[in-house]
Amino acid sequence: MALLKFSPRFFLRTASLFLAAALTAGTPGPKLLPEADESSSSAPVRNIIIDPGHGGVKPGAKGKFGTLEKDVTLAVSLKLKALIEKTMPFRVILTRDKDLDVSLESRAAVANNNDAQVFISIHANGSVRSKSHGAETFFMNVNASDEETRKLAYLENTGEELEKRIADEAQDAVKMILWDMAQAAYVRQSQRLAEMVQEDLNLELGLENRGIKQAAFKVLQGVACPAILVELAFISNPEEERKLGDESYQQRLAESIHRGLVRYLRLFPQK
């Protein structure tokens, strides 16, 4: 009897879908955006997932003048979606397109359920130091680049209800094994995508270059494609908060991320 052969990408997709199902089993989730309808064309549909951070009852960081991270991330994500769909042969799927509370695991599931080529999570930074400023871009690694990055990942991850933490140690071990497999396949592409987006943010906007970093952001875990998390600027810095709330500046942020993505796709063309 002939043995069936599966590609590494098929295996990673299957493993990631199993992970997403394991993490969300038994927990009622929010109504997600529908999966893409591919019936209208015989050509393969290529999807980019944009993830506006936070939402709903989880506003994220809040600025001195009342600007909310969840509003900034959605505004920039919508502008980025429009740019990509206007200039690239990709369909863009948002993990949320309104003020919704979407779990971190469900955001990853949106990427895997739609066979994403790229996953970009958009955030605005916060700090107890109001003078902290600049942009930084992250890709997934279980070991954080430094202590400050480890603390940031912890704050982003524990934004979820604490009761959702995994209690079953065996399930937790499976989660890390599956992610290590996905990480091995996509870490190089994720790093290059992070580098290019970070370079264009700094080049266009003159932001302090806080560099690219690695950390165990929960929203990136289990995503079976190149994945990054972008911290646009510090909403806790009054000067940067004013900029983040300005629609023209949001457009410039979206254009900068778009340019980095274009350069990445030239380096790693999608089949």
Mark where each language-model region is.
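Catalytic-core regions of hydrolytic enzymes
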Residues: 30-171, 184-195, 199, 255
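N-terminal export leaders
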Residues: 6-16
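General N-terminal leader/first-domain-start detector
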Residues: 1-3, 113
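N-terminal and secondary-structure boundary signal
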Residues: 2, 9, 21-22, 37-38
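Basic/polar, cationic surfaces and motifs that engage anionic cell-wall
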Residues: 3, 27, 271
